[in-house]
């Protein structure tokens, strides 16, 4: 009589190993996709971003009469006033940093810890671009970690001028308004190349809360902060 061989089934530990391997492979594949996409964008302009796609879907559901406004313009066709204003407002050390500002990150960490939730990110221009291109508006430490990884990829594969060019053409400036050209037309009926210092300062101040300031254009804070940024613009160092 032939003995029947008993086939052992994978135990919980082995299943956990399999699951961990699948998760690790998926994570690595995602990072490889981001890396390859950024490499391509050195030569090809992004047609859309994660934020744009999210807004397009939201508008199709809530405001079908509206659509995303976005027109790409080359770096040299964007006013130096706007470039200086954004650097003065968002990331004064943009040209010289490596995509991170350690002091700002630590300050944000302390504030978030005190509040018990993420209320501030301490983001540089490159970090903002990483988030806009690939991530969601959700605030979590996992998303922040991914943002830092993508920031490293951007700084590794692109020079500062290319990072800033993509940022200027993809950053959100209102309800469905993306990029300097669309913002210039939307708020001032002009082109990105013709923005004045005062207009540029105002647009720069809107960036942390573009939808709010789109609806509250008469905000005293917006007017006061714009004057401050206008005074700082002359000291802003550009990457070109």
Curated annotation (Swiss-Prot):
Q: Which InterPro entries match?
A: Glyco_trans_51, Lysozyme-like_dom_sf, PBP_transglycosylase, Pep_trsgly
Cellular component aspect of the GO annotation: peptidoglycan-based cell wall; plasma membrane
Q: What is its EC number?
A: 2.4.99.28
Q: How does this protein sit in the membrane? A: Single-pass membrane protein
- Residue ranges spanning the membrane: these are 15-35
Q: Which UniProt keywords apply?
A: Cell inner membrane, Cell membrane, Cell shape, Cell wall biogenesis/degradation, Glycosyltransferase, Membrane, Peptidoglycan synthesis, Transferase, Transmembrane, Transmembrane helix
EC main class here is transferase
A Pfam match: Transgly
Tell me, in one coarse class, where this protein mainly resides: membrane
- Which superkingdom? Bacteria
Any one GO molecular function term: peptidoglycan glycosyltransferase activity
Q: Which GO terms describe its biological process?
A: cell wall organization; peptidoglycan biosynthetic process; regulation of cell shape
Instruction: Look up the record and name the pathway of this protein.
Output: Cell wall biogenesis; peptidoglycan biosynthesis
Q: Which reaction does it catalyse?
A: [GlcNAc-(1->4)-Mur2Ac(oyl-L-Ala-gamma-D-Glu-L-Lys-D-Ala-D-Ala)](n)-di-trans,octa-cis-undecaprenyl diphosphate + beta-D-GlcNAc-(1->4)-Mur2Ac(oyl-L-Ala-gamma-D-Glu-L-Lys-D-Ala-D-Ala)-di-trans,octa-cis-undecaprenyl diphosphate = [GlcNAc-(1->4)-Mur2Ac(oyl-L-Ala-gamma-D-Glu-L-Lys-D-Ala-D-Ala)](n+1)-di-trans,octa-cis-undecaprenyl diphosphate + di-trans,octa-cis-undecaprenyl diphosphate + H(+)
- Location in or out of the cell: Cell inner membrane
> Which HAMAP family does the record match to this protein?
PGT_MtgA
Q: What role does this protein play? A: Peptidoglycan polymerase that catalyzes glycan chain elongation from lipid-linked precursors.
- Similarity comment text for this entry: Belongs to the glycosyltransferase 51 family.
UniProt-recorded name of the protein: Biosynthetic peptidoglycan transglycosylase
- The gene name reads mtgA
